[in-house]
Amino acid sequence: MASPSEQYIFGEFSDDEFKQFFVTARCTVELPPYNEHFFPCGPQSSGDFQDGEECPRIEFGIEEVIDHNTTLPNNTDYSISSNLNPQAPEFILTCSSSPKDSNNVLHENNFDAIDCQFSESSIPDGSGNADSDGTSGTGQRERKKKKKRPPGYYSYLEGVGDVPSETLLNGHANSAGLNSISTDDPDLAEDIPISTTSPRTCTSPDNFVDLNNEALSDDASMHNVLDNTRTAGQPEECSVTSSEQSCIPSDNGRESPVRTAVVQPFAGTDTTENLGVTNGQTLESPEEDTASNGVVLHPEVISLSEEAKAEEISTAQAVIHLPGSASANAPAKSWASLFHNSKPSSTPQVAYVETKNTPPVTSLQVTEKQVEIKEGPVPVSEDPVAIKIAELLEEVKLVHKPVSLQPRGLINKGNWCYINATLQALVACPPMYHLMKSIPVYTKAQKPCTSTPMIDSFVRLMNEFTNMPILPKAKQAPGEKVVRDIRPGAPFEPAYIYRLLTVFKSSLSEKGRQEDAEEYLGFILNGLHEEMLALKKLLLPQNDKIHINNGPDPVFATEEVNKEEQEGSDEEWEQVGPRNKSSVTRQADFVQTPITDIFGGHMRSVVYQQSSKESATLQPFFTLQLDIQSEKIRTVQDALESLVARESVQGYTTKTKQEVEICRRVTLEELPPVLVLHLKRFVFEKTGGCQKLIKNIEYPVDLEISKDLLSPGVKSKIFKGQRTYRLFAVVYHHGNSATGGHYTTDVFQIGLNGWLRIDDQTVKVINQYQVVKQTVERTAYLLYYRRVDLL
């Protein structure tokens, strides 16, 4: 069957060459004249052109037909791309098929869906072609034996039919060539986002990315051909002219971010959000795919026509290596050379792309669903929900009831073991868990900026854990410890907790610094305390001010006495102690918050001086610092007794510059609901710097605070149940070095009525004797106790 319109090419072809390179009504090839005569060689369906008569001259480019009176079929099912060597499978043109209709039956019978050439599968028996019985412009030709092709040579022709199939790009579904970016130009390399996502091909027009078109080609039918055949996430089809490459975007009225002809990340990704990454900056953009230099750019159509070159624009040249293509610097090839060499050149083709430098947009486009998030904490006056949280914290009542949570490990992708170990202990603390669960979780739309990043992060952390029902104890014998298996939840990475170190510019985030679990615990508790103080200030009248205490800091005896002698102390009163001895007690301004109600206690430091009244200072604490350096200290009780022992201060002088002897004694004035004991294993020595004390310190599961440790004024007020504690978490330090090591945590699980050992994302059940048993490699560092009367 003849083609719809007659086209002519020049030169003699063999049967196989004619079949392979016969050009359909989509395009024609002009070869040098053969003996200066024109010979029609296309199949004729009419007698419009006679033998030897000149046919209309049609210029043919590598990828396009430059003809204002184009004869291309107005069909959007085909696309043309560069084909320097049609015999090589890697140069097969991109094309897709569509269901047939009555208007396209003629085309479907005569044209193959790949490269739009005649193929054996597309020509029915008895149909006329250039080598059959039908007449052609060059006369009757003798049939020749068909050349043998290697196995699988025509495999790329399989699957072409009515059902849309996966589109081939240069003979392959993988568009690796688009990701092969030359880094010869460092400026370009910085501005080009490189996607590592594996591309997917798709023939559905709904998945294509449409670009604004400002300068379309003169040939409208070319746009119809090129519009629907691009791979999803692939740049526009490119037309190469004079060793330069220009891209023709699809003509669609919808706006979308710019796609340059140099490189384009593929649309198919494994993440839930599309992120445009440029120059190291990541922008969350659910609806916008790409951002350039932090702003969304609108497309500029790139053209290498003479009119576009005449415009006053700044251009940037980019080099793209196209594997499997001929080198751009190679000498020009004649059309006849196509028949002599079917092997692709090993030298990659270098295509130069000219792009316009679009002026930067001053404002970033933000969708309706997106809300601008300010970096870092803001003042409480700018926080839209700060007053709500303040009112909630003012009315909150601490809940000490144990809660059974499904354990979850924490993924450690860095040196975060000291953080993970501390977080697991805090999650196992019932009043801490209930406090954070009482604060609602706000969305970004409800809370676009925050004055409480630490509170927000720990509210989010506690909501990562779900309740697990407490197992019945009916079958449990008295005194028997039942250990059951447990199925932990999926581990997760609390990256929002790690970021707090940089938000508050903590010294723990400094490189090369030893991470310390006790120091991190103080960082967390002090940070939460300060944020709650700032919220509490919102509820007070404007003339009332709160002095924000940065948390309990250690006070040395000499500094303390000097402060006591200064006039205008914060607060002081005179007390009459035993034997009618009076003492002056001073206390710094201290405002309670829910954090201090859980972890906060008070110590009384009394200074004794000859011929002077006793002076006492109350100072708060979150953790009790226990010195274990002495050889006499083998248990926690020994360390507590050493804490309250009287010590002498040498070298103290009065205002008269007379050296006097003074003594100091520390006692416990107020015991917190949650008592954290810090075993000070890291000490500084004059010869060896910081060293770790590797010694076993025995600690009981049930700890009783002796009355001798209490201040004289509270001994009779605190009952035994209020000074008895039970262990619920232990943080261990692994290793013998003070400048390295690892941290793990054992926590008591009320649902199991037993203990769990958590090492980052590993969770396993252990027995109680394994908790109190220490080894040389693993030593207890932080002990978490709860008051028995609150259990």
UniProtKB/Swiss-Prot annotation:
KW Lipoprotein (keyword) present: no
Q: E.C. number, please?
A: 3.4.19.12
Q: Which UniProt keywords apply?
A: Autophagy, Cytoplasm, DNA damage, DNA repair, Hydrolase, Nucleus, Protease, Thiol protease, Ubl conjugation pathway
Q: Which residues form the active site?
A: 417 (nucleophile), 742 (proton acceptor)
Biological process (GO) annotations held by this record are: autophagy; cellular response to interleukin-1; DNA damage response; DNA damage response, signal transduction by p53 class mediator; DNA repair; negative regulation of canonical NF-kappaB signal transduction; negative regulation of stress granule assembly; protein deubiquitination
Its chief place of residence is cytoplasm
* Subcellular location(s) of the protein: Cytoplasm; Nucleus
Q: Where do the record's region annotations for Disordered lie?
A: 118-156, 270-291, 560-580
Reaction(s) catalysed (UniProt annotation): Thiol-dependent hydrolysis of ester, thioester, amide, peptide and isopeptide bonds formed by the C-terminal Gly of ubiquitin (a 76-residue protein attached to proteins as an intracellular targeting signal)
Residues covered by the USP domain: 408-788
Taxonomy, superkingdom? Eukaryota
Q: What does this protein do?
A: Hydrolase that can remove conjugated ubiquitin from target proteins such as p53/tp53, rps2/us5, rps3/us3, rps10/eS10, becn1, snx3 and cftr. Acts as an essential regulator of p53/tp53 stability: in unstressed cells, specifically deubiquitinates p53/tp53 in the cytoplasm, leading to counteracts MDM2 action and stabilize p53/tp53. Following DNA damage, translocates to the nucleus and deubiquitinates p53/tp53, leading to regulate the p53/TP53-dependent DNA damage response. Component of a regulatory loop that controls autophagy and p53/tp53 levels.
Name-wise, this protein is Ubiquitin carboxyl-terminal hydrolase 10-A
* Taxonomy of the source species: Eukaryota, Metazoa, Chordata, Craniata, Vertebrata
